[in-house]
């Protein structure tokens, strides 16, 4: 698999290098030179496979020249060794596709665990690796869990202080060992900026073996393609004809993966890019002006991102496939409407959380006659226990993954969003 840097097309690397580097020169994201496709006959065969076999088949379309299918199967099985997604009926024409049945109760488990397996496989010389990543909530826990206790790997996670839920924080800031966490006095965009500055410091990058586990890393992105095929396999032939998928969007990695599944050959009619008040992309799609505003805090905190990294990949994909960007559906939802939507879902017999509620709301409002809709459930409601209980006035029991960590002390450090402070921390052995 060859990939090129979106900021410098002359910089081309293979899959192994892209996984290890994370970012290219000038902080550019890597994108596939070739966009593989599957025929309708191949698709029919793939949809009949079990999740692990199908995922191996899909991923091999991208990376078979570097990793054998047998080797890939082994690592996919290890990465996805948890309960697979569930489809839950909400109304006749709208179902929720739950992606939060992994060890950290969020869809990020798919990408983070596959990336950890790829680092394990590709680090043939057992070199020391430092994984630096920023999180707006769920990435931190997924990455920490995926790399916890892994030899020669140090993980450093940045997150905005006071802007993720208490239970999200408990999942990754109580581990210790090779997992280091730093709360930043600022927004997620400040955290992301610090990560990019670290990658721009060539000397630092080389001295500590710097890598990133955000959705900017191509291995995470490719892994997420797999569950879109799973979703398609779980619905009827009739429902497949006019399928619309609503995706809660923060850094837009989840939507990028969905669009890559469509590029590969999955016949999805349309996607809805769903945001909260941090609506840079909906405004851009509406008026053609890219104008990020200051990030605002919302009850759907994992989507509190005003400068999404993966948007450049989406634009590149639309350009390469000659798709019309105007056909991408979009919308943003306020906190008040999110709360009302959570109540609506509860009346329908479904306990959800703010991020999925936003996707449901926009799907419900935009779904046309004869269309069938899926909205992605990206995190377990218990991760937002206080918020959801306050809105629904209904108690939520904690899964064991959260119950086991709730009383553990936080081990986080705290710094201002100043690169020199982070650099000092990174250089400490």
Swiss-Prot record:
**Is Zinc one of the keywords?**
no
Q: GO: which molecular function terms?
A: pyridoxal phosphate binding; threonine synthase activity
The answer to whether the entry has keyword Lipoprotein is: no
Entry-annotated residues carrying N6-(pyridoxal phosphate)lysine: 108
Q: Which cofactor does it need?
A: pyridoxal 5'-phosphate
Identify the EC number(s): 4.2.3.1
Give, as one word, the top-level EC class.
Answer: lyase
Q: Which reaction does it catalyse?
A: O-phospho-L-homoserine + H2O = L-threonine + phosphate
Q: Which SUPFAM superfamilies match?
A: Tryptophan synthase beta subunit-like PLP-dependent enzymes
Q: Which UniProt keywords apply?
A: Amino-acid biosynthesis, Lyase, Pyridoxal phosphate, Threonine biosynthesis
> Sorted alphabetically, which InterPro entries does this protein's record hold?
Ser/Thr_deHydtase_PyrdxlP-BS, Thr_synth_N, Thr_synth_N_sf, Thr_synthase-like, Threonine_Synthase, TrpB-like_PALP, TrpB-like_PALP_sf
Q: Which GO terms describe its biological process?
A: threonine biosynthetic process
Query: What is the protein's known function?
Result: Catalyzes the gamma-elimination of phosphate from L-phosphohomoserine and the beta-addition of water to produce L-threonine.
Official protein name in the record: Threonine synthase
Say which species the protein is native to: Buchnera aphidicola subsp. Acyrthosiphon pisum (strain APS) (Acyrthosiphon pisum symbiotic bacterium)
- State the gene name recorded for this protein: thrC
């Amino acid at each position: 698999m060859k990939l090129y840097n979106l900021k410098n097309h002359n910089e081309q690397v293979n899959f192994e290098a892209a996984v290890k580097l994370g970012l290219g020169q000038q902080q550019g994201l890597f994108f596939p030179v070739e966009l593989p496709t599957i025929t309708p006959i191949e698709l029919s065969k793939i949809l009949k496979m079990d999740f692990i076999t199908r995922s191996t088949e899909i991923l091999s379309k991208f990376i078979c020249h570097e990793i054998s299918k047998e080797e890939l199967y082994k690592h996919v099985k290890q990465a996805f060794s948890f309960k697979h997604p569930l489809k839950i009926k909400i109304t006749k024409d709208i179902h929720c596709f739950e992606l939060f049945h992994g060890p950290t109760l969020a869809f990020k488990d798919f990408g983070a665990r596959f990336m950890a397996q790829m680092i394990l496989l590709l680090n043939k010389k057992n070199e020391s690796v430092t994984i630096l990543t920023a999180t707006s909530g769920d990435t931190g826990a997924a990455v920490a869990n995926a790399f916890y206790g892994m030899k020669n790997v140090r993980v450093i996670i940045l997150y905005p202080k006071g802007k993720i839920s208490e239970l999200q924080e408990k999942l990754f800031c109580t581990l210790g060992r090779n997992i280091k966490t730093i709360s930043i006095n600022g927004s997620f965009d400040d955290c992301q900026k610090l990560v990019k500055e670290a990658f721009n410091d060539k000397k630092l990058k080389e001295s500590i073996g710097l890598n990133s586990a955000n959705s900017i890393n191509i291995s995470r992105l490719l892994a997420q393609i797999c569950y879109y095929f799973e979703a398609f396999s779980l619905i009827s032939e009739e429902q497949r004809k006019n399928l619309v998928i609503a995706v809660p969007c923060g850094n837009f990695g989840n939507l990028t993966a969905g669009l890559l599944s469509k590029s590969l050959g999955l016949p999805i009619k349309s996607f809805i890019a769903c945001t909260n008040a941090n609506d840079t992309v909906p405004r851009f799609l509406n008026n053609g002006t890219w104008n990020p505003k200051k990030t605002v805090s919302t009850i759907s905190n994992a989507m509190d991102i005003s400068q999404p990294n993966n948007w450049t990949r989406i634009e590149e994909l639309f350009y390469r496939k000659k798709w019309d960007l105007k056909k991408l559906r979009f919308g943003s939802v306020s906190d008040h409407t999110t709360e009302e939507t959570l109540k609506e879902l509860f009346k329908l017999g479904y306990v959800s959380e703010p991020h999925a509620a936003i996707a449901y709301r926009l799907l419900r409002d935009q779904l046309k006659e004869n269309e069938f809709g899926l909205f992605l459930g990206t995190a377990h409601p218990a991760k937002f226990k206080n918020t959801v209980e306050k809105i629904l006035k209904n108690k939520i029991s904690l899964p064991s993954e959260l119950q086991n960590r709730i009383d553990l002390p936080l081990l986080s450090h705290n710094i201002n969003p100043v690169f020199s402070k982070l650099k000092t921390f990174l250089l400490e052995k």
